[in-house]
Every structure is written in C-alpha cells, then in structure tokens.
From Swiss-Prot:
Signal peptide: none annotated. Its EC number is 2.7.1.161. PANTHER family: RIBOFLAVIN KINASE. It catalyses: riboflavin + CTP = CDP + FMN + H(+). Gene3D superfamilies: Riboflavin kinase-like. CDP binds at G15, L16, G17, E18, G19, R20, Y116, Y117, L118, R119. This is Riboflavin kinase. The lineage of its organism: Archaea, Thermoproteota, Thermoprotei, Sulfolobales, Sulfolobaceae.
Length: 136
C-alpha cells in the first residue's frame, strides 16, 4: 500500500506557550514516544495557513484516521485526546502535525512537534514560509 502525501504551506507564527506546557506532561511525552517513535521537544511550532489548497488539505486531516493518542484521566484532570499525522517540515523529519481534541486554534493554524527545536534547526522566525509533507 502506498502512502498518500498531502502538502501544506504556511508561515511561522508565535504561539501562546501552551504547547510547551502540554509537551512537558509525562503522559503526552510517553504517548508520543510510543505512537510516533520520538520524544518531542517541549514546544510546538505554530504555522498559519494562508492559501486555499493548503487549507483544503488541512481540512482533509479532520476526516483522515491519523494516529490517536487516547484521552487520559488523572485524579484531578482529564488530558484530552490528540490526533497526530507523521510529517516532515522543510524536508526535516521526524515531525508530526498534532490536532488536540480541545484547542483554541482556528483550522488555519496547525501545530507541529518534532524531537528538534524546529525554529533553531531550520533557522525560522515569525513570518518565514515552510512546507509540510503529511503522510497519510
């Protein structure tokens, strides 16, 4: 079976720092290692999508199966599920687009995780254009 590849282009944008909080929670760290095969850097790279084709490809991800990180109940909170898609960004992998079940982001903003601090590894700053290949 061949892997289908979707292309998404966008520009780097600043986040609120929430990705750093969630990616420091042991449940998510261990789950990403188990399901994606890597321990993510403690922070996400946020990308804003600005063209129609990339946005249509992003919307396909809502319907695609993806890799599901299950919801997890702890004594004083519930950690929501996350849908993930193995990806590369500007030809760097491993990486993954993550779509939390509970998010404040509009559909035009995606979050990327990787074992690397992607801003540094790719010399990125806000407004820089990136291309993501998503493997379905």
């Amino acid at each position: 079976m061949r892997t289908k590849i979707l292309h998404i282009k966008g520009k780097v944008t600043a986040g609120l720092g929430e990705g750093r909080i969630f990616l420091s929670i042991p449940y998510y760290i261990e789950s990403f290692k188990k399901y994606l095969g890597f321990e993510p850097y403690a922070g996400t790279l946020n990308i804003v999508i600005y063209d129609r084709i990339s946005l249509e490809n992003r919307l396909i991800l809502d319907l695609a199966k993806g890799i599901i990180i299950p919801e997890h109940k702890e004594p004083n909170r519930v950690l929501g599920s996350v849908k993930a898609f193995p990806s590369s960004i500007n030809s760097i992998s491993p990486a993954a687009i993550v779509i939390p079940a509970r998010t404040t982001h509009p559909k035009s903003v995606i979050e990327i995780i990787s074992p690397y601090y992607l801003r540094e590894k790719l010399s990125l700053k806000d407004g820089d254009e990136v291309e993501i290949e998503v493997y379905l």
